[in-house]
Amino acid sequence: MTRYEKKQQLGEGTYGVVCKAWDTVCNRYVALKKIKQEREDDGIPVTSVREIAVLLELKHPNVVDLYDIYLEDKFLYLVFEFCDEDLYQFMSRSSKIPINETRSIVYQILQGLAFCHYHQILHRDMKPQNILINKNGTIKLGDFGLARLTTINDRKYTSEVVTLWYRAPEILLGATQYGGAIDIWSTAAIFGELINKEELFKGRCKIDQLFKIFSQLGTPTEDIWNGVTKLPFYLSTFPKWKAKDLHTIFHTDERAVDLLQKMFIYTPEKRISAADALKHPFFDPLNKPNN
């Protein structure tokens, strides 16, 4: 790895340690991830290699670029494009984010997601810390450490995905079969956070997270969400909250509230897709050419 001069540790992601490094061949900064072994004698899991290979094919302006992969001393190194900050850092230093800037950020997130979902890849860990911003201000989806292919329709997945505050209700209720709708819910939570400058559902544990959601959006019933009572962690004793009008939660552009309503639909199959969300009137200023 003499090609890459490590400069500083940036943190630890899903995969392992992340460092800022200088690429001495291409003369640019990169983000270098060193993959953790599950056990010392395991080597690198075949599934990780296979899924990372898929990410090498994910070339899109709003998906972080994976430049290369190296194997050295039984460790796997991923070489990503370097981004200056993440959305969490951006929000932390911004007192108020104008609606036009929010529109641009969410639009780019959805463009990246639509591309991933088209290629049948779920991100499964959408949160501000995993949404990167490069020096040009372009939004990049990052950290695909929990990403999975959905090409096998009846495949069952773990429900232990997505950081708690951004976790979709179907995941919290124990669903093991799910699709891109989980990423849409997470994006809606980020969208709302950009508007209110505060996390929407700050649960301390899974049940508290459910209650935080239900107390704002209402406790789902079979009439609202067909099949909800059959999910593993659903309880008939859940408190019965009524849904609040989203206008009382978000004091912003009417079209933004309407889009949030469609992104926060409980029934996963009815939740708006990333591709359809991009066509929503909220994004008209970005979709319509200037006259």
Curated annotation (Swiss-Prot):
Q: Which UniProt keywords apply?
A: ATP-binding, Cell cycle, Cell division, Kinase, Mitosis, Nucleotide-binding, Phosphoprotein, Serine/threonine-protein kinase, Transferase
User: Which SMART domains does the UniProt record give?
Assistant: S_TKc
Species per Swiss-Prot/TrEMBL record: Entamoeba histolytica (strain ATCC 30459 / HM-1:IMSS / ABRM)
* Binding sites annotated in the UniProt record for ATP: 10-18, 33
Protein kinase domain: which residues?
Answer: 4-283
Organism's domain of life?
A: Eukaryota
Which family is annotated?
Belongs to the protein kinase superfamily. CMGC Ser/Thr protein kinase family. CDC2/CDKX subfamily.
Report the GO molecular function annotations: ATP binding; cyclin binding; cyclin-dependent protein serine/threonine kinase activity; protein serine kinase activity
The record ties this protein, via CDD domains, to:
STKc_CDK_like (cd07829)
PROSITE patterns, alphabetically? Answer: PROTEIN_KINASE_ATP (PS00107), PROTEIN_KINASE_DOM (PS50011), PROTEIN_KINASE_ST (PS00108)
What is the recorded name of this protein? Cyclin-dependent kinase 2
Q: Which residues carry this modification: Phosphothreonine?
A: 14, 158
Modification type Phosphotyrosine: residues: 15
Q: Reaction catalysed?
A: L-seryl-[protein] + ATP = O-phospho-L-seryl-[protein] + ADP + H(+); L-threonyl-[protein] + ATP = O-phospho-L-threonyl-[protein] + ADP + H(+)
EC assignment: 2.7.11.22
The biological process GO terms on file are: cell division; G1/S transition of mitotic cell cycle; regulation of G2/M transition of mitotic cell cycle; regulation of gene expression; signal transduction
- Tell me the enzyme class: transferase
Q: What does this protein do?
A: Serine/threonine-protein kinase involved in the control of the cell cycle.
